[in-house]
Amino acid sequence: MNVFCKIILPLLCIISCSERKEIEVYNMELDENKKEVLVEIRNNTENNYYLLSPIVSIMTKHLQDIGVEMIEGQIHHKKLDSIVCSVCIWDDICKEEYYAMREIVLLPKKSVKKIKYKYDSEEYIEIETVHIGFPYNGYYNEIGKKMQFMLKKKLDSSNIIKGYEFYNKDIETMTIKM
């Protein structure tokens, strides 16, 4: 019993604690009556972070992609957008003819953030999947990693959103299959 308490219990604690992600998609729900998707993202860390443009996509049974817009849980910041455009020149939002601002989602430490998305469809559609992805997180090729490193460095040094830093690590996506 003594060996169990001294060796096995601490080992089990280390394993269970290490499996918890820093930032994770905690829950995702589709409300077909309201035509909304609720996403809950949990920050398990002691730091305040923000995410850039988490994207929900909805695919129908006929492989049609439905437009989805974030309607709750975000802020916008013009200076932050210009910093992102100075690094991510490939981004469509940075093109002059296409003006929009990125959604910024604040994730206070040790909390769950709720984000709502709305989709528009005049007729009834059969939804196949609902998916959330993170376009500014978790690059695997060298160019993407360098761009991500430069973006984090520029955003964090600018301290645009006081008390928060840009979260650029990989976040596991979530997909609901209907």
Where are these regions (language model features)?
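Short Pro-Gly-centered flexible turn/kink motifs
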Residues: V105-K118
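Short, surface-exposed ligand- or partner-binding patches at beta-edge/loop junctions that are enriched
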Residues: S121-F149
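Structural beta-strand segments of beta-rich domains
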Residues: K35-V37
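Short beta-strand elements
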Residues: G144-M178
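Bacterial Sec-dependent N-terminal signal peptides
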Residues: M1-Y26, V39
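The feature marks short-to-medium sequence segments in extracytoplasmic or secretory-pathway proteins
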Residues: L51-L107
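Asparagine-centered strand-capping/turn motif at beta-strand->loop junctions
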Residues: V39-N48
